[in-house]
Amino acid sequence: MNESQMPRRLPIRHRVRGYSLIELMIAIAVALFLLAGILLIEEGTHQTSLNQTGLAQLQDEERVAMTILSNVVQLAGYYPTPAAVFPKNELELLLPAVGALQAGQGIYGQKDANGNEVLTVRFLTNSGDGLLNCLGNPNTTGASSEYDNVFAVDNVNHQLTCAVNGGPAVALINNVQSVTVLYGVNSTTTTRFDNSGAADVYLTANQLTSDFWTNIYSVKVTITFINPLAKQPGQPATIAFTRVFGLKSRVGVNV
């Protein structure tokens, strides 16, 4: 039998083996597990970033609010003429009685319908002396001027506002829930404009008599902010900050 007559062998076909269904399911499960882990890490990173942003914003709002209040409240009853002795008669002439304020009185507070303090602070400035009202504006009129600053809370928009000399209220900061004020007085004296002592008790506006309103040495302000992290477990709905401001006019300081 010659070669041409011999039976021809068919080539061996190698069978290509794919993944079984079980292997595919395991691979998909592992991939989903890894993807879930990545998403959790991403969500945690995003939430941490939001928390840090919210806290930073809260700190900025607290700092701005207290800085403005400090600058203005310390000037309550201030007048530009230096004097060694507190000038009772002169101050009464420079700051005449108006509305609820007595002659010479530089600060006054009352509650609004929601229990928030409406704080009025007035002082005198000379043109170009650099003293700022609550809106951050100096006196550039070319003459002496009185600034009446009225702080209040916009309960609808949760904003601390201020109006100057009867003008419109301007929003200063956001996320304010409430503002309370206590007034530091010397309970042992009823002499008007007595700057010989120091505050020994803090009272609400309703507890102050007319004599006390002319003898306020310091003011304790508490601003309660809406907590940006309030939705997280264990976090309070609000956060309160308290500061005490001394009145320069009560200690004979002329800026």
Model-predicted segments: where are they?
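Aliphatic-rich helix starts adjacent to a transmembrane/signal segment
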Residues: 2-4, 12, 16-80
